Amino acid sequence: MDSFKGGMNLERLPESLRPQPSHDMASSFHLQRSSEPRDPIENSASESSDTDVPEKERSESRKTREDGGAGSAGCTGAADDPAKKKKQRRQRTHFTSQQLQELEATFQRNRYPDMSMREEIAVWTNLTEPRVRVWFKNRRAKWRKRERNQQMDLCKNGYVPQFSGLMQPYDDMYAGYPYNNWATKSLTPAPLSTKSFTFFNSMSPLSSQSMFSAPSSISSMNMPSGMGHSAVPGMANSGLNNINNISGSSLNSAMSSPACPYGPPGSPYSVYRDTCNSSLASLALKSKQHSSFGYSSLQSPGSSLNACQYN
């Protein structure tokens, strides 16, 4: 009884006398025991899943960031590729002497060849048409630069001395009208009182003769017919004598006057002599015409008179 009161000790009983548990109890016990250790496993799995989720999210976010960075880098690289290609300089074309001679000869003939001509040149020189076009473009730029430099050199060497030469007369502008001694300062200018003006010396004898011969011709034309034909030759001879005297005096004054500063000293006198001789000949012809006109005008009334009128 004590044993029953104190509890049944199953360990002291032999295995044959031990009560065998039923199948239901075993299954329930097994399920209970199997369910008990699964709780911590599930808890541990849940805990591990709770801890792994942020890590996975972090890893995924890192992967997405890395992928995005790689994509952006790829985009920037793709965007930089054309720039790199543009920055890369093309290799220079090395022309041979024969090609350069052919191109230079064509450039001397035509500085702006068209498309067909460039293609022909490319065939001749064994080059491509773009290379020929670029060569002509560079050659035209070089030619324009050379032309500008030459013009600048001409301006510097040509116009500066002329400007300095034009600035010289301001030193002695009112020192006696020294018009012809800009380059030669050693020549002393003549004073104003002794300097003869070239206006009267430059007058041709033809104009002076015409000035002085006009009154004689007018007087001979306006003479009355009653003075007779003897007055007409006298006036013509006096007019010729006056013309000779005037022409001689004008030539002597021209010879004695200083040379004209704006022309060679010996060239005008031969022209004056020729004009003088020609003017004298023309005046002689005019005087003969006037004399013949006077004779006819004087003789015409006498021929109309009858013999009875003289009585």
From Swiss-Prot:
Q: What is the role of this chain?
A: Sequence-specific transcription factor that binds gene promoters and activates their transcription. May play a role in the development of anterior structures, and in particular, the brain and facies and in specifying the identity or structure of hindlimb. Acts as a transcriptional activator by binding to promoter sequences with a TAAT/GCC core motif.
Q: Where is this region: Disordered?
A: 1-102
Provide the residue ranges listed under DNA-binding region in this record.
Answer: 88-147
Start-end of Basic and acidic residues biased regions: 53-68
Span list, region Interaction with PIT-1: 148-277
| This protein's name | Pituitary homeobox 1
Task: List the gene name.
Answer: PITX1
Q: Which organism is it from?
A: Gallus gallus (Chicken)
The UniProt entry, under InterPro entries, shows: HD, Homeobox_CS, Homeobox_Pitx/unc30, Homeodomain-like_sf, OAR_dom
